[in-house]
Amino acid sequence: VAHFRNITLEVGKGVFVPRPETEWVTGLAIDAVKACATAEPIVFDLCAGSGAIGLAIATEIPNAQVIGVEKSADAFGYTSRNYEKLAPTNGRAILADVADTPNDLDGKVDVVISNPPYIPAQMVPIYPEVALHDPGLALYGGEDGLDVVRVVADVAARLLHPGGTLIIEHADMQGEAVRHLLLDKGWTQVRTHQDFNSRDRSVSAIRSH
């Protein structure tokens, strides 16, 4: 099992074990959801893994409707079981590639959050337990580490309503690159956020009107 904010998750082989930095990024998403004007905010967690981020939101904000999307069949076993256990009424898990996220809620979503694979292909993770135990599919994001980030940004642009919030976790050396990526795609209010170690750890952006 893994403890994450106020929840306990089932994890095992084939699923990424959530890190403390992601708890902090999740806090940003929770603040964004709480700021929503809608009575039942809709939240997507893309690249959901164990479901940690989405389920923390679903349990801390019971009026939110949370959908987790995960492409790995191995990981999805944990995603679906954790959703059934922790958010049976206000959460659901979907087995799909991010690019194939269902379109039935396009333009209606309030917040999209993602902790995508973002490690450049040549980099060896600094944490031995990551290199040895976490699945490569959850870690590596292509040559510059941003392949999946680009897809997440495009999918979020169709999911979110104008004024909706996107939050993406990234590596500490990717802050500027992710900012420019989102600005080039037309996102507004693009901001880098530093974690508890004062390292660039995530970006937030608003879908323009």
Report the location of each language-model feature.
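Conserved Class I SAM-dependent methyltransferase catalytic core
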Residues: 143-206
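Conserved AdoMet
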Residues: 1-32
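Mobile active-site "lid"/loop adjacent to the S-adenosyl-L-methionine
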Residues: 117-148
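Conserved beta-strand segments of alpha/beta enzyme cores
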Residues: 8, 65, 90-92, 188-191
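Conserved SAM/SAH cofactor-binding pocket of Class I
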Residues: 23-127
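Generic C-terminal helix-cap and adjacent flexible tail
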Residues: 34-36, 188, 207-209
